[in-house]
């Protein structure tokens, strides 16, 4: 019985360490694989990441402030270009 308990504890420890290592590794990157529900709230597991709203078609994702600002600027630029294209005379748009 003692052997079974120690094996279970060992496996549980390995799983817990793996989860901690995953969070630590993802905190070093600008993007996290973590999705969130409250844009601009600090509810992400990494203290350096915030919940960022990318677009209506994508889920909000945890990332650094700088990456979030550049992603949102890119989305606005893309939308602006689409609107400008739609206003073009029809013969130029083809």
Swiss-Prot record:
Expressed by the venom duct. Contains 4 disulfide bonds. GO terms for cellular component: extracellular region. The modification 4-carboxyglutamate is found at residues 30, 34, 37, 40-41. Coiled coil: none annotated. This is Conotoxin Gla-MrII. It comes from the Eukaryota. GO terms for molecular function: toxin activity. It is found in: Secreted. Its main location: secreted. Belongs to the conotoxin I2 superfamily. The cysteine framework is XII (C-C-C-C-CC-C-C). Residues 78-94 form a propeptide. The lineage of its organism: Eukaryota, Metazoa, Spiralia, Lophotrochozoa, Mollusca. Keywords: Disulfide bond, Gamma-carboxyglutamic acid, Secreted, Signal, Toxin. Residues 1-25 form the signal peptide.
């Amino acid at each position: 019985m003692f052997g079974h308990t120690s094996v279970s504890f060992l496996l549980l420890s390995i799983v817990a360490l793996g989860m901690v290592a995953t969070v630590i590794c993802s905190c070093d990157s600008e993007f996290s694989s973590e999705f969130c529900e409250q844009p601009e709230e600090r509810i992400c597991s990494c203290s350096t990441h915030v919940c960022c709203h990318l677009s209506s078609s994508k889920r909000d994702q945890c990332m650094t402030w700088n990456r979030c600002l550049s992603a949102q600027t890119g989305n606005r630029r893309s939308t602006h270009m689409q609107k400008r294209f739609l206003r073009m005379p029809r013969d130029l748009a083809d």
